[in-house]
Amino acid sequence: MLAMGADSSFAPALPGYDFEFPRDHGAHDEYQTEWWYYTGQLEADDGRRYGFEVTFFRVGIVPPSARRLAAGEPASKLPALRGDERPAGNPWDLHDLSLAHFAITDVKSKDFRYYEKLNRTSPFTASQAAGHLDVFNEGWRAVTMPDGAWRLVAAAGGDAIDLTLRSHKAPAVHGQNGVSIKAAGVGGASHYYSMTRLEVSGIVDGRRCHGLAWMDHEFGSSRLRENQAGWDWFSIQLDNDTELMLYQIRRRDGTPDLTSSGSLITSDGSVIHLGHDQMRVQPLARWKSPKSGATYPMGWRVSVPSLQIAVTLQPLLNQQELVTRESTRVTYWEGAVSVSGSFDNVAVRGQGYVEMTGYDRPLGALR
């Protein structure tokens, strides 16, 4: 996760970054940490409902400049890499770690199952292409198909998905001037965009399904500050063809950090930036995990008064927590939610996902 340790040898996320697609769907080795996050809700032909999460992480160990020096390139001749270039050197050297999470929420059986992977990045076990989307980790993969759609596959235990995702909107870039601020100071930010309305069709556990998904792609070299405990992130897809992304960085005293922000994505794909003072998030209940002992908010009232948005989010299951001892070693809650409320005084319904970190221990303390 982006809260993990930062190395100043990697590039900081700075204002002025110009996104370019499909280039920026690919990997960015010059930044230390990067993730591709897929979440969605699906309905099978027989009415069975599912939530899913598939996430690919890349954590840099050796920055590209050091790899190129090791390959014999003189420091005076090391121009910046383009987004579609990879550094020279032996591809089997340990440059990056590749981690992945896969989770299924089975609403009918009230069951939540998750799986994790950790590998060194190498040509045949786990890698991330530059310049276009193609990331994989031991058989789990997100890749661009010839017609421009994405294919997402993962299988573990008794669970398997094989999904086709087609975007109905352009990428939504979050933040301002190319950066999403997470902490005070130079480089305390990430480059962050989302694909907020992905039409999905495919197979989940042998059942043909359809639905909506959301993809986040974020890259940077920062970590949470010592006084920051974690974050609460919300993705909301409404039936009026608008979407809402909010994140609240939590301080250790439980109050929202001033770097918290969000975005409203309109029906035509325009992105409206939301500052911390425009958002309201009110927890409605609490749930204590029997696995980690962490106590999480459970149910939320989310509002943006300036846009006349007021919605209530309810989890499809309380138990949607991942305790990832074999990969990222971060305990977090990532779960499917239902959404109902009003937008500009008109009733709306929808779906979403919520992510909560730092409730078992502050992430800002991780080094």
Walk through the language-model features, giving the residues of each.
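Structured soluble/peripheral alpha/beta segments that form catalytic or ligand/cofactor-binding pockets
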Residues: 1-367
